Structure formats: C-alpha cells, structure tokens
C-alpha cells in the first residue's frame, strides 16, 4: 500500500502489486525449492485480481503437486512448512531482467556473474536461438574512479537491441556496488552455513531495470543463498 500511495503523490499510479513467495523449506543446505511455488499479482479495482485472492493462491501453492512430490522425495515433513509472502510492485514493462551471483563461478579471481536480458525475455527458459548478456564483473579496476571491470562472455541477440548491450557500463558499476553491499551485509550479519572466505560467499540476487514510474533505475527484487 505504501508503494501505491507514494506513486499517487508523484502523479503516477502503480496499479499492480506482485506477490512472490518464500517458505521455511527453501534454500536449505540439501534442498533449494526454487521454482516449486507460484507467484500472483493483485490489481487495483479488479474484482478478480484482489489482494485477498492473490494471497490465497500463493498460500495454496504450498500444496501443489510438484511441491508436495519434491518435499516427499527429500523427506521433508510437510507439517513443518510455513510460507511467507514478499510483496513488491509489479514490472509490466520492464527494461531488463537479470540474476547476479556474488562469486566467480569460473576461477579464483574475485567477481560476480551477471546474466541479464532485454525486457521480459526469459533467461532461464529462452526462446530458441535467443541469447542473453552474460558478464563476468571483476571486483577490481585499473580506473581509480571505478570498482569493477566487466568482461562479456556472451551477448544478447534480441533484434530490438540493434547490437547494443542490455546494461550500460554505468549501470553495471551501480549494480556491482549494490550487490557488494548486500554481500557484505549477509556475510557478516545473516546466519549462513558457508564455512568459506568472503570471496567464495555466494548470493543469488534477482534484479529488474525499469523506467515506468521514474527515470531508468535498478531494483533489487530478491536475495537468496546461492546453492
């Protein structure tokens, strides 16, 4: 509700709110649970897409068949599970979507892996022949005014980009700064099972880039341990 009130004060109204989920049998050392549950959106002045209906549907997805079957396979007591709901504004016409992992998955050089794609093109389930930008964002720079050095591992071939990159160098720098702060906080303040040095501590960070209600900016959508 705070998001809606603020946007009205700015003269622009966010009419849709999304309800992703998290729950107590997720991101365990032996069980991720990612993708098993459902997210729904609510829309202002829509009799069918009400907040109440969205919450009920999210809660009900705790008992969808794929989630039940997966928990059973890993011998998780269904009665021990509880679900929480993350509420955020929806992004009906995002400029970019992406995922960042806060460790180098390829070698020992400090850095992040970024997978980002134009608009709502899927990274996880891409259309045949469609590639996304993958960037190794090294956590150092020979430029004293920058903290990171990007190295592209693949390039998006979405025709609408006309060969341009999904994120600008300035946005990559900004995203790196945000995620380094998040990594520092989680490593030092949030209990975790990673008995590892800071360089090897991995978080999976989902982000959006959007310009619907303000000038183009980065939104951190979700943070979870990288398993």
Residue ranges and their predicted role:
Residues 34-65, 92-159, 219-227:
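Extended active-site and interfacial segments that coordinate phosphate-rich ligands
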């Amino acid at each position: 509700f705070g998001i809606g009130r603020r946007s009205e004060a700015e003269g622009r109204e966010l009419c849709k709110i999304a309800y992703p989920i998290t729950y107590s049998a997720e991101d365990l050392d032996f069980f991720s649970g990612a993708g098993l549950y459902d997210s729904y959106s609510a829309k202002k002045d829509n009799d069918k897409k009400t907040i109440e209906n969205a919450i009920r549907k999210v809660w009900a997805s705790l008992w969808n068949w794929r989630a039940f079957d997966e928990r059973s396979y890993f011998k998780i007591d269904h009665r021990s599970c509880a679900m929480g709901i993350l509420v955020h504004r929806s992004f009906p016409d995002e400029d970019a979507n992406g995922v960042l992992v806060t460790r180098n998955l390829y070698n020992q050089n400090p850095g992040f892996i970024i997978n980002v794609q134009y608009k709502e093109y899927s990274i996880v389930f891409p259309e045949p022949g469609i590639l996304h930008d993958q960037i190794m964002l090294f956590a150092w720079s020979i430029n004293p005014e920058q903290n990171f050095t990007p190295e592209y591992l693949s390039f998006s071939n979405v025709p609408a980009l006309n060969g341009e990159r999904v994120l600008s160098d300035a946005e990559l720098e900004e995203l790196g700064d945000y995620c380094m702060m998040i990594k520092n906080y989680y490593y030092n303040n949030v209990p975790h099972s990673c008995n590892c040095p800071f360089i090897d501590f991995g978080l999976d960070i989902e982000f959006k880039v959007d310009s619907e209600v303000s000038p183009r900016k980065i939104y951190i959508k979700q943070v979870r341990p990288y398993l």
